[in-house]
Curated annotation (Swiss-Prot):
InterPro entries: Run_dom, Run_dom_sf. Keywords: Coiled coil, Phosphoprotein. Residues 160-235 form a coiled coil. This is RUN domain-containing protein 1. The gene is RUNDC1.
């Protein structure tokens, strides 16, 4: 830039000084001998301004404010502004030309370093680029700019106009022209940037792929995904938010993935059915084939030189030489039997696939139906519970005025066999009645039987067993584990409160859920080390519930736990049918009574023995 300024200053001096100075300059510009020629500074180098140019600029700056807006075109101020605008155009043109030459040099280096097969293509691209022309880098200058008075041409090429005299149409045209030039410049700069990244990547100085190549590959991937997912995003992609686009993509992926998952599950189910069918066929073949192999016919066996109706163990493994015909008939019978069983098994599998409900009702024996109907009747269990509740209530009311407390003498009687009447009524009558009513229709859910063995089980007595029964105490233990009771009871704050007898919750009431978890934890802690039965643990829990007057609330928590009731109770059970409401009403008769029952009665003697040793 400074070199261009130094080159443009003599022109300005010629316009300001006059003909005499012009003649002197022409004399100075006479060609010098080659030995005395002065070498010019390179383009873009910094050059110091000469004293004459500095004085001229100061003088022009001093004259510029004095120029009137309506001064004629040949006034010094307007001439100075025009020369400055021309100087800016020359600077921009020189910069564009230098950039163009640099691009040509860059492409020439690509041609030289390129492969022989690529040189022809690079030369054609160089030719196209060389004749394309330099980009127009002049920005749009507003109407108030001094350079806008003369436009883009030289002085005298266009009529002199004021900015306010220009029409709106001319302004719009100039703006549109400027925008087009800017677009062309941006496009050319992008092309040059892509070429530079490509060359740097080929030379090894750029690690990642060029941005244009990355965008092209990403576009290919996105287009293929859109085709595979059957999505139409060309219309409303601009109006959708990021979350809406994500939801559309998830929905499209789900349409493809979900059927595949269903097919995989169906294939796994069919594999399981086929595997179970093969096991069933092998089982029946073993049952049917064993009589054929050990059938009671007359056979001749050479075992110790004796012939008889039976065969000894040493001679049974040998094949008699005269029984080849009998063996062929046996093999034929086995094949026919196997084919018959295969047809029956396929028929059963087809029925199962159609019905999906296992055996028909007509295949159930009448005696079994009567027995099941008898088991479903829970009215005797309710009567037994009512009788036990009334007996416990009578015994408790009889001992209420005396504050039923287990003393040391009573404890000695208990250990020696003299049982307390109220305690025995609670443990042997009330707890058993509650246990039987809770166990009505209760079973342990097990995924052991496959889908194929369910309908086939009715054909074989060995597979027609009822679901495995479950003890009601296990229901309380499952509730304890489901509610993470161990973490609640063994928390540091609760341990400290138990050690120092301080309330944890700051005086708030303990909920039934918290008290139930604590009670189950205490029963498990005391009874599990001594391997006590589930009945003993349930009796201890009932005694603790009566002592705390929470029997109804604790049982109600189990009844309201849907995650335990649904998978462990039959639809015809008392729990699923009535929700245990009538039983809770019966047990509520004991809620107002105070009890002080021993909880560790089943492990007290064992604890004493352990303490003794």
């Amino acid at each position: 830039m400074a070199a261009v300024e130094a080159a443009a200053e003599p022109v300005t001096v010629v316009a300001a000084v006059g003909p005499k100075a012009k003649d002197e300059e022409e004399e100075e510009e006479e060609p010098l001998p080659p030995c005395e020629a002065v070498r010019w500074a390179p383009v873009g180098a910094v050059a110091e301004a000469r004293p004459g140019a500095t004085a001229f600029l100061e003088e022009a700056t001093a004259e510029e404010p004095g120029a009137a807006p309506g001064s004629p075109p040949d006034s010094p101020g307007r001439t100075l502004r025009r020369l400055r605008a021309e100087r800016r155009r020359l600077d921009s043109a020189l910069l564009a030309l230098s950039s163009h030459f640099a691009q040509v040099q860059f492409r020439l280096r690509q041609v030289v370093r390129g492969a022989p097969a690529e040189q022809q293509r690079l030369l054609r691209e160089l030719e196209d680029f060389a004749f394309r022309g330099c980009p127009h880098v002049l920005g749009y200058e507003g109407p108030g700019d001094p350079a806008s008075d003369e436009g883009d041409g030289l002085p005298g090429d266009r009529p002199w106009l004021r900015g306010e005299d220009q029409s709106e149409q001319e302004k719009q045209e100039r703006l549109e022209t400027q925008r087009e030039k800017q677009k062309e410049l941006i496009l050319q700069l992008k092309t040059q940037l892509d070429d530079l990244e490509t060359f740097a990547y080929q030379e090894g100085s750029y690690d990642s792929l060029p941005q244009s190549v990355v965008l092209e590959r990403q576009r290919v991937i996105i287009d293929e995904l859109i085709k595979k997912l059957d999505m139409n995003l060309n219309e409303d992609i601009s109006s959708l938010s990021t979350e809406e686009l994500r939801q559309r993509v998830d929905a499209a992926v789900a349409q493809i993935v979900n059927p595949a998952r269903v097919k995989e599950q169906l294939v796994e189910q069919l594999k399981t059915q086929i595997r179970d069918l093969e096991m069933f066929i092998n089982f029946i073949q073993d049952e049917v084939g064993s009589p054929l192999q050990t059938g009671g016919g007359h056979c001749e066996c050479k075992a110790g030189g004796k012939t008889g109706n039976g065969c000894s163990r040493t001679g049974s493994s040998r094949t008699p030489p005269g029984n080849s015909k009998t063996k062929a008939e046996d093999v034929k019978k086995v094949r026919e039997t196997g084919l018959h069983l295969m047809r029956r098994a396929l028929a059963v599998l087809q029925i199962f696939a159609v019905s999906q409900f296992g055996c028909a009702t007509g295949q159930i024996p009448p005696t079994l139906w009567q027995r099941v109907q008898a088991d479903r009747d829970y009215s005797p269990l309710l009567k037994r519970l009512e009788v036990s509740v009334d007996r416990v209530k009578q015994l408790a009311l009889r001992q209420q005025p005396h504050d039923h407390v287990i003393t040391s003498a009573n404890l000695q009687d208990l250990s020696l066999g003299g049982k307390d009447e109220l305690t025995m009524a609670v443990r042997k009558e009330l707890t058993v009645a509650v246990r039987d009513l809770l166990a009505h229709g209760l079973y342990a859910s097990s995924p052991g039987m496959s889908l194929v063995m369910a309908p086939i089980a009715c054909l074989l007595p060995a597979f027609s067993s009822a679901p495995e029964a479950m003890h009601p105490w296990e229901l309380f233990v499952k509730y304890y584990h489901a509610k993470n009771g161990r973490a609640y009871v063994e928390s540091p704050a609760r341990k400290l409160s138990q050690s120092f007898a301080l309330p944890v919750t700051g005086g708030t009431v303990v909920t039934p859920k918290q008290s139930l978890l604590t009670a189950i934890h205490m029963v498990l802690t005391e009874h599990d080390p001594f391997k006590r039965s589930a009945d003993s643990e349930l009796k201890a829990l009932v005694c603790m519930a009566l002592n705390e007057q929470r029997l109804v609330s604790w049982v109600n928590l189990i009844c309201k736990s849907g995650s335990l009731i649904e998978p462990h109770y039959q639809p015809w059970s008392y729990m699923a049918h009535t929700g245990f409401e009538s039983a809770l009403n019966l047990l509520s008769r004991l809620s107002s009574l105070k009890f002080s029952l021993p909880v560790d009665l089943a492990v007290r003697q064992l604890k004493n023995i352990k303490d003794a040793f």
